[in-house]
Amino acid sequence: MAEQKKQLLIVTGMSGAGKTVAIKALEDMGYFVVDNLPPELLGSFWELINNSSDFSKAAVVVDLRVKSFYKDLVDEIKSLEDSQNVQSTVLFLDASDDVLVSRYKETRRLPPLAHTGRLLDGIQEERAILSRTKNISNIIIDTSRLTTKELKAKLVDKFGDNQTRTFSIEVMSFGFKYGIPIDADIVMDVRFLPNPFYIPQLKPFTGLDRRVFDYVMSKKETKKFYAKFLDMLETAIPGYIAEGKEKLTIAIGCTGGQHRSVSIARQLAVDLAKKYPVDISHREISRYIGQ
């Protein structure tokens, strides 16, 4: 089977049109990204990428921060493709003048060519210089009416792969007495539920034991709470996915992480696994096994 040809993505466009957002989105998709690369170094960069097994997807950002070199960008792209048989894609990010003016006013920054301090003059001069590059671009995205989330979604749609779009959930039980997990996105306190700790026959065991699990899950208070909690999660999770989140960590806590949190986490993992990939872990369980 022939080795898959590496591709080079060249990102350019108007200052303020979303290149910073694009960098973060591409990195999240597994791209090796170099920002502010002078066009004359494109050939050297590609040689490095092409000869390395560490990088399968690479992107460079070139804009007018390197104005003295930018005029050579189109020629450098053509030279690179002719001499090294590179399959490159040029992405041009654009936005209307009025939107760019508004964005610069919000950030209190100036475009790179606003030498006199006049925003519009700098934007229009930049647009004129970039026109040749825009004409040879493979993909042009106008970000004028796009939110950050919408721009990320467009980039994932065009440059992502199936693996990029995966979403998974980790359900974790823990004990508050040992600290809240710092990487949890959602923390649910179930210390208000009936506690098997006070049942002598159940105290030595954990929520992994069927007797403890049945005790916790059969209680009226648990059933009422769990139904509402699951409904809340099923409502919220699509929103997390829409925001581009790849992994959601749900932490369920009771006092020691032995009985109630383990039982709830077990049931939650079963129910969420009907729709999503789910991993489950019990942070404190080793404290109680083998006692």
Swiss-Prot record:
Organism: Lactobacillus gasseri (strain ATCC 33323 / DSM 20243 / BCRC 14619 / CIP 102991 / JCM 1131 / KCTC 3163 / NCIMB 11718 / NCTC 13722 / AM63)
Database matches in SUPFAM superfamilies: P-loop containing nucleoside triphosphate hydrolases
Binding site for GTP: D63, L64, R65, V66
Family: Belongs to the RapZ-like family.
Superkingdom as given in the UniProt entry: Bacteria
Pfam families according to UniProt: PapZ_C, RapZ-like_N
Protein name (Swiss-Prot/TrEMBL): Nucleotide-binding protein LGAS_1315
Residues the record lists as binding ATP: G13, M14, S15, G16, A17, G18, K19, T20
Function (record text): Displays ATPase and GTPase activities.
Entry keywords, A to Z: ATP-binding, GTP-binding, Nucleotide-binding
Keyword Nucleotide-binding: yes
Transcription regulation is among the record's keywords: no
Gene3D superfamilies xrefs: P-loop containing nucleotide triphosphate hydrolases (3.40.50.300)
